[in-house]
């Protein structure tokens, strides 16, 4: 039995996740494996590479840089978040991603993408943190309408949150029976049908299975939340979530807003750190029995 960490996406609500992860790293809290979705995928990699503060640092540094994210990028390239700047210039030069530490960490790391042809989730294990792995992370965070379809091998991929927003059942199926789950919505949140569905239906006319996955995403999401609530109440899994709605834009240009959400994550984690540690110690003890 293995311990896992599951990271929901949510665009810049992911700063909450970044705050939680930095506290976990500072406290030396680790798990056997983790899986990230969308923002959870591109921010969570820094937990495996143990780069405390990197996520909030590069986001606050470049949030006002049009090379990073802008509607100009979207009109010129089809990507709101620049592929070249976000996934090459920043991690390779400006704020280097430590792929060596990522590769040497014993923690398994998975990302979730959505296959646009089938509407199904694709779960990819990132082993080295190399350019191909970063490409999978990019695909996981490529939001419909805001990013081009990412081609990897024979796949056409978009945001993993469409097919599997919180991949608890996937992680259970591969042996992660006791999990920390970081959500980016408060308790009681209920997802509604995507109001952009007519636009998505028109934009992805060639991919009807993907459109249907978008159409019923809210139903699958809410059912997964109910399942997670049951796991939480039974003590099998431990859920970390913001106390109130985070209220931050998908493309946030105010570094103070990014820091506010990040500090909310830190505060929640600091309050709960002893409970988190106790949960994992109990899970590890059970695994040894």
Predicted regions and their residues:
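Patatin-like phospholipase
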Residues: 1-37, 45-289
